[in-house]
From Swiss-Prot:
There is a cross-link at residue 1533 (S-Lysyl-methionine sulfilimine (Met-Lys) (interchain with K-1651)). It comes from Homo sapiens. The gene is COL4A3. Residues 43-1438 are annotated as: Triple-helical region. Residues 49-78, 167-469, 502-1442 are annotated as: Disordered. The lineage of its organism: Eukaryota, Metazoa, Chordata, Craniata, Vertebrata. Residues 1427-1444 are annotated as: Epitope recognized by Goodpasture antibodies. GO terms for cellular component: basement membrane; collagen type IV trimer; collagen-containing extracellular matrix; endoplasmic reticulum; endoplasmic reticulum lumen; extracellular region; extracellular space; intracellular membrane-bounded organelle. Residues 1445-1669 form the Collagen IV NC1 domain. Prolines at the third position of the tripeptide repeating unit (G-X-Y) are hydroxylated in some or all of the chains. Isoform 2 contains an additional N-linked glycosylation site. Residues 217-231, 253-266, 402-411 have a biased composition (Basic and acidic residues). This is Collagen alpha-3(IV) chain.
Length: 1670
């Protein structure tokens, strides 16, 4: 019995002995009875016979009466102890215990969270009216009142007296005027200066204990060392005595109860000798025989690599070496016939162990395995030597330390002046600092400013108050008449009433041509005008003096010369959309023609009629124009109205000549600031300024940590601090680099170790019987030819072979008319290639095919190939068609506030307003406060068009060109139309066997056969001989092109690739596309012919018809590049081809017009509750300015104030806003060179880009470096020469049991097997013809996940190599972050006209316009009210039969959206949602239903609500679980958040099928078949249950398609949290159906541990099936 099989219970059968009873006949001696009445028996009486055999037992008699009760028997002997009884059944539940004592009162609970704010209370009642307030303070004087209406005309003054005439006598002062009315209260004063800071307040009391924080996150999985085994515990106390009930069975099947325990018996007789005792402890020196091997233990966990042992003693001389090098590899043999189908294997840990095979040859060295888990802690090492280590990488910046003590005073070191630095780029504008101290007031007057531009006209002032009445005038009797100087021009008169419009005047004379304007944007082409009459050019008129009368209009002049190019006109309105023209012929794209000569100028159109007057424009005020030339004096105006009579004036002397220049006047007021100067040269560096105040922190993310600063000077020793708290244990560190290899130690033999603890007693093995030596085996028959070795590397392409003999040409049937092809260009004759050498004849293959050998182990990975040369740059692709619109993106985060934009360009010049009448100068007012920001102006008219040129009409066809040079080799053409299928040729001789093909995909199930009667299992038959070849069938007719195929099912998992290192191999050559053949119709299934023998080769047949298109050949070598041909003739237009393949994406179009400002985004979700702020934290940064308030109503106009006196000097005002950045000032004077104080340490800078390689450094010092790490394993060396024979070694110890002998000879072939199952799907047919382009298909399913690659050894970074060759230009990157502001550029060109300003004051009402044209159709109106109920309609037609839809979900377990299986349609796609856990309770989704496919992903897809009508989202320790993808987690296993989660979440598709879908599970590693009448949708692994946090989870119904996942993963789902993170956690488990051996159904399961790589062999397989529609 094998040691691995469980012992079976043996049943002892007691044989029954059947005794045949023979009756012995009695001996008769001479007694004859003749008659019935007389018998004469003479002779003596015989002796008594022997006792006969007992007769057979009689039938049992009737049951007797119960006998009387017997006397009690004597006390029996003491019985043997009985066997332990069976375990009794579970007892009845006990009575509930008494209630326990009351517990001690609990500790007081922590204070609860602060409750939410209560609802707004009901408004209170209005209060009672208050008492009368105190009278207010008297107001300030009001402004002067509005001047009253003009009074009545005064009385005429008294006549002047004739006596005492005085000239220039001044009248008496008038009476004081009446006091004005009360003025309005004055404006509030300016705010006072900022007061000094108050004294610091006292420290506050400690705050109340904060609320209890939310439940913490799940802890990280810490992988520690496994602890050492504990010491065996002490022996426990003795258990309670067991009760033994012994039932004695007496004779007559009566049950006697056992009596009381008897007295102790007397000493018994000495017993027989006992069995031999256990062997005693051996104190001798001999070693016992080796015991039998024990049972196989569980596979242990991988151990830790031990420390390297000390160097061993030099070994003895080795045995002679192996055979020499292997010979050259033989040629590849013929492929063997396919083997029989093997039996289904089950993964069973309990299979019996077979005979041990012969040891195989040592395999090649495997790839380096993954790093094992950490071993137990090693022996403490010897103390290491202390050497200073290399400088570590800069650490992260630490927390800000407390302020240090005041440093020692520094030394006054005078540094040498530095060389002047270059001008730095202007820095970013700093944030505004605090207000500075008030500056000194200097009354120095500045130099006079430049002449300012003329100011705008002031608004008319208010008429002044009437002056006092004048003195009566003097009577002038004999005054000489001297005319006074001409008076000032009078005020313009009031506007007259609008006159009647005059008739249309005659056309004026044509003006002289203007100076050419700037080149304008091209306008839209105008419509051609009608031909005008040519006019004669008139003479240029002279400038008439303004006194002349307007002459009669002259005759039209002669036609003038065409004027210079005028300014561009305003773009015309777009014309009406024209009718579509006739469809043009499809032209071949011609070469771009040369630019034609400029066309003749068109004839000028006649002037159109004058349009109606437009409304006055509301343009903004334009920039002031250039100063005009002096105008001609105007015509004399109409005589003014008589002015009031002037007072009599004495003759004024005529003004004399100008006097000498006067003394210099007082300095004038400070002029306006001048125009900024040009940029000065780079000045000398200024002195370092003092430290500025810390600015307001800007809006930005914290920068990366800066590099480590230089070491500071050592500070003074601080005072001793308080002892700190015990720190938290740190996170486990990353494994350190391997240490330097130690020096070999001197090996000393160690002393005897301490005796170990006694081990646990092992299971006793069974003793096997010593077998007899076996007979020597028969010599084996020679083995069959081995199978092919692995496919070799592709060889170099050989030279082209010689030209074969010409084939025989038989005319085939005429093909159908092909489509006319395009005219090809005539190529030049190529050069003749060289003839290659004739190949050697091949070695003839053997007649017999070998049996297939076992799959060889994978070979040693080849050397890493070098990177291939860069390919030539491809031709640019055609622009692609526009892809479908992408899905709406997620709302982005709110952007940061932008910087202040530059000032806008000046507006368009406005039309000049009408001149106002001059007002009386008003009183100078005080400077007003800045007004509120006005409302946004209306949207401007559209700007000038950006269409750079208009497409002209189609040109005439060009002249015939010259013949072109032959063109370069074109791109690969589109596959041609499929040819007709040729007749099938006679079978050729057998070709050489091809390489082993890939495993085909599973074929579709055949039509169901009739249900056969199950036969009994026959014996295995002998393999039959090969049958004859069947006759050829007739070729089927060519089928029509098939529809595009659906996506194929997912192929089998590929073999694992070899690790090739990190560099990719060179790209293989591209194969030529094969010609697609026609897809034939499906032929009828032929009757299976009997298998025939391979007949002899027949005579050579007649040449066959042309064969079907061959398989695609290997790519031929590239030909030499031909010369570029001359341009060919333009061919006739071809027939319109089928639609082309989609091109590459087109280049981005020009930037569109900026769209309107979008609406505000949806408010984002509320953020998490922040942590409690620090006590006495510094004030936060300054907030952004608030939103602009609504514009207030316009106030009533104020009254003018009296001119005030000059006020006292006010306090210093607050600092104004930062102005626009000025131009750089002129270079300053050179400063004194005094070293400034060292500034505070700057913030850490961002990491710089790597610099260019530096110059070679100086030679290093000759210092012996530290011993380097052990190098990686080298390639195995060639086999060495045999060594010399060694000395004879001492006799060895008793060896271990030897390996089993070589395998015996190959057995006879078995009996004929059962017929195999239906074969797999055949090779795919030839390609069908190209169908019309289908719609853009869905994204294909992802490929099967490959086996995990080998572990890459991450090496430390080496020193930077020399700069590589420049790479190909990369793809366009995403826009980078905004850079710092650049230097101030030069002044730009004059800007375009600005947008329209605010509308001016409304003009007079215009005349009624004409009726407008019909407008565009308006937008759809809102839904109307529901109409009245209609009449009952006619009865409808009978309903059509509709298919019932059954919905299921398919999960890809990758980031690709899965496709629906054939015969089903997708409804929508989403993300694979597994289950949620809320309030420590889990609820899951069936993965086969549409509830497991959510269309939006979030780490917290649910919220919870309570009875208070309050809902909380993402604010508790709840979880959600999603199916994951095979994407690898980061090395540090940090949680993933944000956009980085996308590659980890599985995608899914909800599909609708015509019938229900179920899952079938095999509980073996074989994929189960679908039931009869069902079709397969997909195959997978049986997934049953999952649990995670708190051991909560749910499961899948095994009938649901969700229980059959297409990929197996030990961790198939991610755990996500409300805080936005996801990760894999160690307490997440997945449960799968196991693979079972049917022979072990009712046996105890054997515990086993299966490691990665073997997992898929123990998982049950399954298949999802859907019922067919008949």
């Amino acid at each position: 019995m094998s040691a691995r099989t469980a012992p079976r219970p043996q049943v002892l059968l007691l044989p029954l002995l059947l005794v045949l009873l023979a009756a012995a006949p009695a001996a008769s001696k001479g007694c004859v009875c003749k008659d019935k009445g007389q018998c004469f028996c003479d002779g003596a009486k015989g002796e008594k016979g022997e006792k006969g055999f007992p007769g057979p037992p009689g039938s049992p008699g009737q049951k007797g009466f119960t006998g009387p009760e017997g006397l009690p028997g004597p006390q029996g002997p003491k019985g043997f102890p009985g066997l332990p009884g069976l375990t009794g059944s579970k007892g009845v539940r006990g009575i509930s215990g008494l209630p326990g004592f009351s517990g001690s009162p609990g500790l007081p609970g922590t204070p609860g969270n602060t409750g939410p704010y209560g609802l707004v209370g009901v408004p209170g009642c209005s209060g009672s009216k208050g008492e009368q307030g105190f009278p207010g303070l008297p107001g300030t004087l009001g402004y002067p009142g509005i001047p009253g209406a003009a009074g009545l005309k005064g009385q005429k003054g008294a006549p002047a007296k004739e006596e005492d005439i005085e000239l220039d006598a001044k009248g008496d002062p008038g009476l004081p005027g009446a006091p004005g009315p009360q003025g309005l209260p004055g404006p509030p004063g300016f705010p006072g200066p900022v007061g000094p800071p108050g004294p610091p307040g006292f420290f506050g009391f400690p705050g109340a204990m904060g609320p209890r924080g939310p439940k913490g996150h799940m802890g990280e999985r810490v992988i520690g060392h496994k602890g050492e085994r504990g010491v065996k515990g002490l022996t426990g106390p003795p258990g309670p005595p067991g009760t033994v009930i012994v039932t004695l069975t007496g004779p007559d099947n009566r049950t006697d109860l056992k009596g009381e325990k008897g007295d102790k018996g007397a000493m018994g007789e000495p017993g027989p000798p006992g069995p031999s005792g256990l062997p005693g402890e051996s104190y001798g020196s001999e070693k016992g025989a080796p015991g039998d091997p024990g049972l196989q233990g569980k596979p242990g966990k991988d151990g830790v690599p031990g420390f390297p042992g000390s160097e061993g003693v030099k070994g003895n001389r080795g045995f002679p070496g192996l055979m020499g090098e292997d010979g050259i590899k033989g040629q590849k043999g013929d492929i063997g016939p396919p083997g029989f189908r093997g039996p289904t294997e089950y993964y069973d840990t309990y299979q019996e162990k077979g005979d041990e095979g012969t040891p195989g040859p040592p395999g090649p060295r495997g790839a380096r395995g993954p790093q094992g888990p950490s071993g137990p802690p090693g022996v403490p090492g010897s103390p290491g030597s202390s050497r200073p280590g290399l400088r570590g990488a800069p650490g992260w910046p630490g927390l800000k330390g407390s302020k240090g003590e005041r440093g020692r005073p520094g030394k006054d070191a005078m540094g040498t002046p530095g060389s002047p630095g270059c001008a730095g780029s202007p820095g970013l504008p700093g944030s505004p600092g605090p207000p500075g101290p008030p500056g000194d007031i200097v009354f120095r007057k500045g130099p006079p400013g430049d002449h300012g531009l003329p100011g705008y006209l002031g608004s008319p002032g208010i008429p002044g108050v009437d002056g006092p009445k004048g003195e009566p005038g003097l009577l002038c009797t004999q005054c000489p008449y001297i005319p006074g100087p001409p008076g000032l021009p009078g005020l313009p008169g009031l506007h007259g009433v609008k006159g009647i419009p005059g008739r249309q005047g005659a056309a004026g004379l044509k003006g002289s041509p203007g100076s050419p304007g700037n080149t304008g944007l091209p306008g839209f082409p105008g419509f051609p005008g009608a031909q005008g009459d040519p006019g004669l050019k008139g003479e240029k008129g002279e400038t008439l003096q303004p006194e002349g009368q307007v002459g009669v209009p002259g005759d039209p002049g002669l036609r003038g010369q065409p004027g210079r190019k005028g300014l561009d006109g305003i773009p015309g309105t777009p014309g009406v959309k024209g009718l579509p023209g006739p469809k043009g012929e499809l032209a071949l794209s011609g070469e771009k023609g040369d630019q034609g000569p400029p066309g003749d100028p068109g004839s000028p159109g006649s002037p159109g009629p004058a349009g109606p007057a437009g409304p006055p424009g509301y343009g903004p005020q334009g920039e002031p124009g250039l100063q005009g030339t002096q105008g001609v004096p105007g015509a004399p105006g109409p005589p003014g109205e008589a002015g009031p009579r002037g007072e009599l004036s004495v003759s004024t002397p005529v003004p004399g000549p100008p006097g000498p220049p006067g003394p210099p006047g007082h300095p004038g007021p400070q002029g306006p600031p001048g125009i900024p100067g040009s940029l000065g040269k780079c000045g000398d560096p200024g002195l370092p300024g003092p430290d500025g105040e810390p600015g307001i922190p800007g809006i930005g993310f914290p920068g990366p940590p800066g590099p480590k600063g230089d070491q500071g000077f050592p500070g003074t020793k601080g005072s001793l601090g308080c002892p700190g708290k015990m720190g938290e244990p740190g996170l486990p560190g990353k494994p350190g680099l391997p240490g330097a290899k130690g020096e070999p130690a001197v090996a000393m033999p160690g002393g005897p170790g301490t005796p170990g603890f006694p081990g646990e007693r092992g299971n006793s093995g069974e003793h096997g019987e010593i077998g007899l030596p076996g007979l020597p085996g028969l010599p084996g028959t020679p083995g069959n030819e081995g199978l092919d070795g692995p496919r070799g590397d592709p060889g170099q392409p050989g030279p082209p072979g010689e030209q074969g003999p010409p084939g025989r040409c038989i005319e085939g049937p005429r093909g159908a008319q092909g489509l006319p092809g395009l005219n090809g260009l005539k190529g030049q004759q190529g050069r003749r290639g060289k003839t290659g050498p004739k190949g050697d004849p091949g070695i003839p293959g053997l007649d017999r095919s070998g049996f297939p050998g076992e799959t060889g182990s994978p070979g040693i990975p080849g050397h890493q190939g070098e990177m291939g040369p860069l390919g030539q740059r491809g031709y640019p692709g055609n622009p692609g068609i526009l892809g479908p619109p992408g899905e709406d993106g997620v709302i982005g985060m709110m952007g940061f506030p932008g910087a202040i934009g530059p000032p806008g360009p000046p507006g368009n010049p406005g039309t000049p307003g009408q001149r106002g009448s001059p007002g009386i100068p008003g009183v100078k007012g005080q400077r007003g406060t800045p007004g509120a920001k006005g409302e946004q102006g209306d949207k401007g008219n559209p700007g000038p068009s950006e269409i750079s040129h208009v497409i002209g009409d189609k040109g005439e066809p060009g002249l015939k060109g010259f013949a072109g040079n032959p063109g370069e080799k074109g791109n690969r053409g589109v596959p041609g139309m499929p040819g007709l299928k040729g007749l099938k040729g006679l079978p050729g001789p057998a070709g050489p066997p091809g390489p082993r093909g890939d495993l085909g995909s599973t074929g579709n199930p055949g039509e169901p056969g009739l249900r056969g009667i199950p036969g009994s299992m026959g014996n295995m038959g002998m393999p039959g001989s090969k049958g004859k070849r069947g006759t050829l069938g007739f070729p089927g007719r060519a089928g029509r092109p098939g529809l595009p195929g659906i996506h194929g099912l997912q192929g089998d998992k590929g073999e694992p690739g070899y690790s090739e290192g990190t560099r990719p191999g060179p790209p293989g050559p591209t194969g030529d596309p094969g010609l697609p053949g026609d897809m034939g119709k499906k032929g009828e299934m032929g009757q299976p012919g009997p298998p025939g023998h391979l007949g002899p080769a027949g005579p050579e047949g007649a040449p066959g018809s042309p064969g079907s298109p061959g398989l695609p050949g290997k790519p031929g070598p590239h030909g030499d590049l031909g010369f570029k041909g001359i341009k060919g003739l333009l061919g006739p237009p071809g027939i319109r081809g089928p639609p082309g393949l989609p091109g590459f994406p087109g280049s981005p179009g020009p930037m569109g017009i900026r769209g309107d400002q979008g609406r505000d985004g949806i408010p984002g979700p509320a953020g998490e509750k922040g942590e409690t702020g620090l006590l006495r934290a510094p004030p936060g940064p300054r907030g952004n300015p608030g939103a602009q308030g609504a514009k207030g109503d316009r106030g009533a106009p104020g009254f003018p104030g009296l001119p005030g006196r000059k006020g006292a000097m006010g306090d210093a005002g607050p600092r104004g806003p930062t102005g626009i950045e000025g131009f750089p000032g002129p270079p300053g004077l050179p400063g004194a060179i005094i070293p400034g104080q060292t500034g505070n340490r700057g913030p850490p800078g961002s990491r710089g880009s790597p610099g260019a390689p530096g110059p070679p450094g100086p030679p290093g010092s000759h210092v012996i470096g530290i011993k380097g790490d052990k190098g990686s394993m080298g390639h195995p060396g060639p086999k060495g020469p045999p060594g010399t024979a060694g000395d004879m070694g001492p006799p060895g110890r008793l060896g271990a049991p030897g390996t089993p002998g070589l395998p015996g000879p190959r057995g006879d072939p078995g009996f004929q097997g059962f017929p195999g199952v239906k074969g797999e799907k055949g090779n795919p047919g030839f390609l069908g013809s190209i169908g019309p382009p289908g719609p853009i298909g869905p994204k294909g399913p992802p490929g099967v996940r490959g086996d995990p690659g080998t572990l890459k050894i991450i090496s430390l970074p080496g020193s930077p190599g020399p700069p590589g060759t420049p790479g190909e230009p990369g793809m366009q990157g995403e826009p980078g972050p905004p850079g710092p502001p650049g230097n101030l550029g030069p002044c730009g060109p004059r800007g375009k006209p600005g947008k329209d300003g605010k509308p001016g004051t409304p003009g007079p009402a215009g005349e009624k316009g004409n009726k407008g044209s019909k407008g565009e159709p308006g937008p759809a109106g809102s839904d109307g009210l529901p109409g009245l109920k209609g009449k009952r309609g006619d009865s409808g037609s009978p309903a059509t039969w509709t298919t019932r839809g059954f919905v299921f979900t398919r999960h890809s377990q990758t980031t690709a959206i899965p496709s629906c299986p054939e015969g089903t349609v997708p409804l929508y796609s989403g993300f694979s949602f597994l289950f949620v856990q809320g309030n420590q309770r889990a609820h899951g989704q069936d993965l086969g239903t549409l509830g497991s496919c959510l269309q939006r992903f979030t780490t917290m897809p649910f919220l919870f609500c309570n009875v208070n009508d309050v809902c909380n989202f993402a604010s508790r320790n709840d979880y959600s679980y999603w199916l994951s993808t095979p994407a690898l987690m980061p090395m540090n296993m940090a949680p993933i958040t944000g956009r980085a989660l996308e590659p980890y979440i599985s995608r899914c598709t909800v599909c609708e099928g015509p019938a229900i879908a179920i899952a079938v599970h095999s509980q073996t590693t074989d994929i189960p078949p679908c039931p009869h009448g069902w079709i397969s949708l997909w195959k997978g692994f049986s997934f049953i249950m999952f649990t995670s946090a708190g051991s909560e989870g749910t499961g899948q119904a095994l009938a649901s398609p969700g229980s059959c996942l297409e990929e197996f993963r030990a961790s198939p789902f991610l755990e996500c949290h409300g805080r936005g993170t996801c990760n894999y956690y160690s307490n997440s488990y997945s449960f799968w159906l196991a693979s079972l051996n049917p022979e072990r159904m009712f046996r105890k399961p054997i515990p086993s541990t299966v490691k990665a790589g073997e997992l898929e062999k123990i998982i049950s397989r399954c298949q999802v099936c859907m019922k067919k529609r008949h």
